Amino acid sequence: MRRPAILAAAVLLAPLAACSTVKEAVKGPDLAPVGYPAPLAPMQQQYVSAREPAPQAASANSLWRVGARAFFNDQRASRVGDIVTVMIDIDDSASTKNATNSSRTANMKAGVPHLLGMESSLGKFLPGGFDPASALETNSTTTNAGSGGVSRSEKISLTIAAVVSQVLPNGNMVIQGTQEVRTNAELRQLTVAGIVRPEDISSANTIRHTQIAEARISYGGRGDISRVQKTPAGQSLVEKFSPF
């Protein structure tokens, strides 16, 4: 009874998987949502529970507030709704080159001096005769050569303002920001999201993209130019599902 149920479930779930594949082929892959913690691998992540920040005790007869980083006021983002400037300066490059060469030659020769006394009689039935000293002989030669290379370079230099959307129990903050610029019929979109530490925010209320955990950075656009540069949906589907 269980086998038909499993087959029925597979049949019902197959269209859902196909729909997801079709959507990705047409619209492109989506960024993973930002959460805390975000699953970095297909397994259950175990994290130490974040501790609550220690309460700030008031200092009697003092103008200095415990935990403050400035004498008058800390102007850096620290609460939900505060704005922090994200400095994005990506200049990455990678180059890989591999080459493989292999060859192998094998020879084998075997004789049968005695074959139940029939070694002399076999020559009468075989067209070329029978030589017991070279009854079996094989030769094989294998040669394999392969090479591959990957070269990639990315450079992005942008500045975007993000909003604190959540303050975690340990004091870290979840930020997310979106910037859109429209030029004629082309819309450029820049999004950034991730988790930052208050200590990493500079006195100018800025933070570098390398200091953002679970960073999700997207730079793209949509419009007439992007539509022309994009592969048609029909062609994408054919290339996605074609076995050749």
UniProtKB/Swiss-Prot annotation:
Species of provenance: Caulobacter vibrioides (strain ATCC 19089 / CIP 103742 / CB 15) (Caulobacter crescentus)
Pfam families documented for this protein: FlgH (PF02107)
Protein's name according to its UniProt entry: Flagellar L-ring protein
Lipid-linked residues (N-palmitoyl cysteine): C19
Subunit structure: The basal body constitutes a major portion of the flagellar organelle and consists of five rings (E,L,P,S, and M) mounted on a central rod.
Membrane topology: Lipid-anchor
Family: Belongs to the FlgH family.
Keywords: Bacterial flagellum, Cell outer membrane, Lipoprotein, Membrane, Palmitate, Signal
GO terms for MF: cytoskeletal motor activity
Gene: flgH
InterPro entries: Flag_Lring
Lipid attachment points (S-diacylglycerol cysteine): C19
Functional description taken from the UniProt entry: Assembles around the rod to form the L-ring and probably protects the motor/basal body from shearing forces during rotation.
Highest taxon in the source lineage: Bacteria
Coiled coil regions in record: none
Gene Ontology biological process terms in this record: bacterial-type flagellum-dependent cell motility
GO cellular component term, pick one: bacterial-type flagellum basal body, distal rod, L ring
Region forming the signal peptide: 1-18
HAMAP family: FlgH
Subcellular location: Cell outer membrane; Bacterial flagellum basal body
